[in-house]
């Protein structure tokens, strides 16, 4: 039998309600099993991102609550710190509270990963998605 640790987490009510709907839809035996599955997916994504090497081009998509204290200023400051790999940014208003930025990047994968991690860790950032490709047409036939 696998050793188990019991943990406690705090979640916004609406986030938990949406998660519970997915649990029911997918037929999980328990909330714990669904959380374990979600953590596994997160670990796989993290390992994939951190295994990238070499020159890459891609996008970092960010959704954030623009009312969150200083989030826009912090995101801008971070982006200025990585001006050598940022090619362009696109800003879009999603609704009254949320904005989306798409940051086009090109450079060494380690710098892209570092930028993604810094953006992800900011308070007020709701979601970050990194998509990368190998530049220069080095795509297998």
UniProtKB/Swiss-Prot annotation:
Stored Pfam families: NikR_C, RHH_1
Binding residues for Ni(2+), per the UniProt record?
Answer: 80, 91, 93, 99
Q: Which family does it belong to?
A: Belongs to the transcriptional regulatory CopG/NikR family.
Q: Which GO terms describe its molecular function?
A: DNA binding; DNA-binding transcription factor activity; nickel cation binding
InterPro entries, alphabetized: Acetolactate_synth/TF_NikR_C (IPR027271), ACT-like_dom_sf (IPR045865), Arc_rbn_hlx_hlx (IPR013321), CopG (IPR002145), CopG/NikR_regulator (IPR050192), Ni_resp_reg_NikR (IPR022988), Ribbon_hlx_hlx (IPR010985), TF_NikR_Ni-bd_C (IPR014864)
The protein, known as? Putative nickel-responsive regulator
Cofactors demanded by this protein: Ni(2+)
Domain of life of the organism in this record?
Archaea
Cofactor: binding details: Binds 1 nickel ion per subunit.
Q: Keyword set for this entry?
A: DNA-binding, Metal-binding, Nickel, Transcription, Transcription regulation
Q: What does this protein do?
A: Transcriptional regulator.
Q: Does the keyword Metal-binding apply?
A: yes
Q: Per its UniProt record, what NCBIfam families does this chain match?
A: PRK00630.1 (NF001884), PRK01002.1 (NF002169), PRK02967.1 (NF002815), PRK04460.1 (NF003381)
* GO BP term (any one): response to nickel cation
């Amino acid at each position: 039998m696998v050793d188990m640790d019991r943990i406690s987490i705090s979640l916004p009510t609406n986030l938990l309600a949406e998660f519970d709907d997915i649990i029911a839809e997918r037929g999980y035996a328990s909330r714990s099993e669904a959380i374990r599955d979600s953590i596994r997916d997160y670990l796989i994504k993290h390992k994939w991102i951190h295994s990238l090497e070499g020159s890459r081009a891609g996008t970092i998509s960010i959704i954030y609550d623009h009312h969150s204290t200083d989030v826009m200023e912090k995101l801008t400051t971070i982006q200025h710190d990585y001006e050598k790999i940022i090619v362009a940014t696109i800003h879009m208003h999603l609704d009254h509270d949320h904005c989306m930025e798409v940051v086009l990047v090109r450079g060494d994968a380690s710098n892209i990963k570092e930028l993604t991690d810094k953006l992800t860790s900011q308070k007020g950032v709701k979601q970050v998605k990194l998509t990368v490709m190998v530049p220069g047409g080095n795509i297998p036939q």
